[in-house]
């Protein structure tokens, strides 16, 4: 499990959120880098 805190509003009231991890997709590292370079994004 993991969690994060979101501070909202002018009083910075904390909201606590918990979630469970999901498996990463089976994608090679830097698989999208070539497409992004062609678009001039990076």
Curated annotation (Swiss-Prot):
Keyword terms, alphabetized: Cell membrane, Cytoplasm, Hydrolase, Magnesium, Manganese, Membrane, Metal-binding, Nucleus, Protein phosphatase
InterPro entries linked: Metallo-depent_PP-like
PTM note: Activated by at least two different proteolytic cleavages producing a 56 kDa and a 50 kDa form.
E.C. numbers: 3.1.3.16
Superkingdom of origin: Eukaryota
Cell compartments where the protein resides: Nucleus; Cytoplasm; Cell membrane
Record text on cofactor binding: Binds 2 magnesium or manganese ions per subunit.
Any one Gene Ontology cellular component term annotated for this protein: plasma membrane
Quaternary data: Probably forms a complex composed of chaperones HSP90 and HSP70, co-chaperones STIP1/HOP, CDC37, PPP5C, PTGES3/p23, TSC1 and client protein TSC2. Probably forms a complex composed of chaperones HSP90 and HSP70, co-chaperones CDC37, PPP5C, TSC1 and client protein TSC2, CDK4, AKT, RAF1 and NR3C1; this complex does not contain co-chaperones STIP1/HOP and PTGES3/p23. Part of a complex with HSP90/HSP90AA1 and steroid receptors. Interacts (via TPR repeats) with HSP90AA1 (via TPR repeat-binding motif) or HSPA1A/HSPA1B; the interaction is direct and activates the phosphatase activity.
Family: Belongs to the PPP phosphatase family. PP-5 (PP-T) subfamily.
Protein name: Serine/threonine-protein phosphatase 5
Native source species: Oryctolagus cuniculus (Rabbit)
Gene name per UniProt: PPP5C
């Amino acid at each position: 499990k993991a969690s994060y805190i979101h501070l909202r509003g002018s009083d910075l009231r904390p909201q606590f959120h918990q979630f469970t991890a999901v498996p990463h997709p089976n994608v090679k590292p830097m698989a999208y880098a070539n497409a992004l370079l062609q678009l001039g994004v990076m």
